[in-house]
Amino acid sequence: MSDIIKLTHVRKEYDDGFVALKDINLTIESGKFYSLLGPSGSGKTTILRIIAGFSEPTSGQVFFAGKDITNLDAAKRKINTVFQNYALFPHMNVFENVAFGLQIKKKDKQEIKLAVKEALHMVQLDGFANREISELSGGQQQRVAIARAIVNQPKVLLLDESLSALDKRLRKDMQFELREIQKKLGITFIFVTHDQEEALAMSDEIFVLNEGKIQQSGSPVDIYDEPVNDFVARFIGDSNILSGRMIKDYEVEFGNHRFECADAGIKPGEKVEVVLRPEDLDITDIEHGKLRVMVESQLFLGDHFEIKAIDSDENEWLIHSTNPTNIGKEVGVYFDPEDIHVMRFGESEAEFDKRLEAYEGDE
């Protein structure tokens, strides 16, 4: 796939001295679903606004299909945005809202009618053309906003926290629908969110941001299974993170025990952090466990039990299990070498990728 959006060395500093973006470099390929994921103030919405043309970078360049659009007006970019509050016109009905952009462009009336009908069909709102905006649910208003954006046939669609106002059930439904719409249209979606589950569920690629920097980028599986640092490991899903020490390639020490692992390329004796995901830990009898822990609490969350336990060194453990246990009971915890992920302090994403490629190539 060809690159459609590229940001090179983009920095955004405001008049009060606050730096929202620090040397952002990212590439967006055509036809994929991307998420910009991070906490409040991480810079994700600032990136979206710079891509849309609503804000100019202090330095750096923005490219669209190889052309420098850094200083190009937002109206001249082949990019549309769906805002968090949908920005629908309450005095217009559904048809008029969706048709608005085409009418501004002075398109033929019959052409507008057909385009609006097709856009509403795409978002499953057939028969809603004459409805008033006030008569629609939050999910239906979301669909109207998307229809209004896609009717203009943009090359890129930007979505700014556009599911955050919906309830949990409707949000999950819309995640599926957005993904299906993107696949049908074949255009690039860039979705801004602070919700890890949304990003993991919908995206082909994720950019994880914090404090104005891209912490890690990659597929949802890669980012979840191979977090590059402590922030990513904690922000993307639940994690058990312990201090450790590398013994040698494929062997690490933590919790006063040595374990076989799947990591290499780290100096023997180097201090590291070790990540174990709660769902990768199995409760077993003490004899078959690699660790011995005491169960402190247990919550039933519908599809699993969330168990909190503590070992003899007072390390706290979070375990997700489909089977309950007893509070106060000593149990064994089992995990495979591949379940251990070792992180180096201060290792950049580029350094991490290089190390990973080196030892995977030796296997």
Swiss-Prot record:
Give its localization: Cell membrane
Q: Name one GO molecular function term.
A: ABC-type putrescine transporter activity
Protein name stated in the entry: Spermidine/putrescine import ATP-binding protein PotA
Sequence similarity: Belongs to the ABC transporter superfamily. Spermidine/putrescine importer (TC 3.A.1.11.1) family.
| Membrane topology qualifier | Peripheral membrane protein
**Subunit and interaction comment:** The complex is composed of two ATP-binding proteins (PotA), two transmembrane proteins (PotB and PotC) and a solute-binding protein (PotD).
Give the protein's biological function. Answer: Part of the ABC transporter complex PotABCD involved in spermidine/putrescine import. Responsible for energy coupling to the transport system.
